[in-house]
């Protein structure tokens, strides 16, 4: 489910903008094939499921599908079809990720619904595929529902701990605000919040003129610093006005905070072991928590599948 706070085994990691789905459904309804890029993450820090398949020994059991060079510094790509034995092993390993006891122990999440697959990219594409299927399902017989190609979506399954997957922080810059009032309101919003380092969430601010400092929020209710900050900023902007920009790179933040009515916040990069717990306990990541990798590392649209 792409609904916020859902307890399904496959979940969105960020809020789904429902207004984005109908225009996409309009395109998908009449499309005979899909060429999506939907990245779904599994939490496999020991690298036991996908990585062993990339060895030369494992590839000898597979049949080649294609091999080609790519444009725009994309390098080369080769695709292989798993043998029946390999595919069955992967299915068993993925099923084991959904074991309730393993889940509860791994995440200290006794009583929480099991999360197996977390959306990494293409959340709205998968949400559209799901919405189209729900629309089509009542028009099919139970037998047709079992085998109809629109029941499934083509996804790229990626280990969260894949070395090529790099999380980069997204910082905040606000314009058209009074920095002194904003900081005073921030401290007032969280009991015990104070200037300087301490126990809890530490958030770095940048004032006009380049002055930097740290605010500590003790006993935070959110899993991540960005959650603590974004909850406050959303409320502040709603009540006081102003504009927010989401920025990559600390140096860019510092150069933008040059006007007297601006302020910047530098956030730490989310670590990989924080992603699943945050979705499990907070329901979703705060908006613009992180970006994944550089543009030239992103996946090319290579595979298509029939959906009619």
PLM regions: where:
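Surface-exposed, charge/polar-rich loops and edge strands
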Residues: 1-308
